[in-house]
């Protein structure tokens, strides 16, 4: 990928999921209602073993970036979707307890930011580190989204539902697309490089140029 756009590999993962979603939804539809959540959870757990498969790729191709490796992330969203139409149970009660659900998100985030999930730089992770990083990413995403979709669904969030936040959310995708290109310009401007400090300056300039 072109320098400054290396994050775009994730788009192929996302688009692949969207293309497969009708088939996945149909397969879930064929299951008994009570079997759907266990089946989706089982697929999520099984996907963490993707790196154990004897897949040989060309140099520079990382099969840990292929869609099946991130099935747990998409499974988290599918589980939340199932729970939105399920009778009130422990997921709903957990989502309505901010201390517990945000505590789970915080702990998972701290684990994903620790050496257990790999070094801070862009060195390829080991299989164990990849499993920790990916699984904790799924937990963080599910924990942050659960209160929004399971606690008073259909009611606009008093903070995230206001026009300013909705607009920023709409713009955020553009920032995702361009933030690395902005970083490529910002680092020479401030005379620093990745993981070497000047966080505030780099953040401000990247945000301005990214938008």
Specify the residue positions occupied by each region the protein language model found.
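Membrane-interface helix caps and helix-loop-helix hairpins in membrane proteins
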Residues: 2-5, 55-64, 123-129
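Juxtamembrane segments of multi-pass membrane glycosylation machinery
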Residues: 25-33, 191-192
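Active-site alpha-helix of zinc metalloproteases
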Residues: 9-10, 175
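Membrane-interfacial entry segments at the cytosolic side of transmembrane helices
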Residues: 31-41, 90-102, 197-201
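Alpha-helical membrane-protein architecture signal
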Residues: 2-5, 9, 72, 161
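Specific transmembrane alpha-helix
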Residues: 10-28, 41-91, 107-112, 133-156, ...
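Alpha-helical transmembrane segments of multi-pass integral membrane proteins
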Residues: 70, 74, 78-79, 100-211
């Amino acid at each position: 990928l072109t320098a400054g756009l290396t994050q775009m590999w994730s788009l192929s993962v996302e688009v692949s999921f969207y293309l497969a979603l009708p088939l996945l939804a149909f397969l879930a539809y064929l299951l008994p209602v009570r079997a759907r959540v266990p089946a989706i959870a089982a697929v999520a757990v099984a996907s963490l073993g993707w790196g154990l498969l004897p897949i040989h790729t060309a140099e520079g191709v990382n099969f840990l970036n292929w869609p099946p490796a991130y099935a747990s992330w998409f499974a988290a969203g599918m589980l939340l979707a199932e729970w939105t139409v399920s009778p009130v149970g422990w997921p709903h009660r957990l989502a309505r307890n901010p201390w517990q659900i945000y505590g789970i998100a915080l702990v998972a985030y701290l684990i994903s930011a620790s050496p257990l999930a790999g070094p801070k730089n862009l060195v390829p992770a080991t299989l164990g580190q990849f499993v920790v990083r990916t699984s904790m990413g799924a937990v963080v995403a599910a924990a942050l989204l659960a209160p929004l979709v399971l606690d008073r669904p259909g009611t606009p969030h008093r903070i995230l539902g206001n026009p300013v936040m909705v607009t920023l959310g709409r713009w955020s995708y553009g920032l995702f697309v361009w933030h690395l290109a902005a970083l490529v310009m910002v680092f020479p401007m401030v005379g620093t490089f990745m993981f070497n400090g000047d966080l505030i300056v780099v953040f401000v300039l990247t945000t301005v140029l990214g938008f």
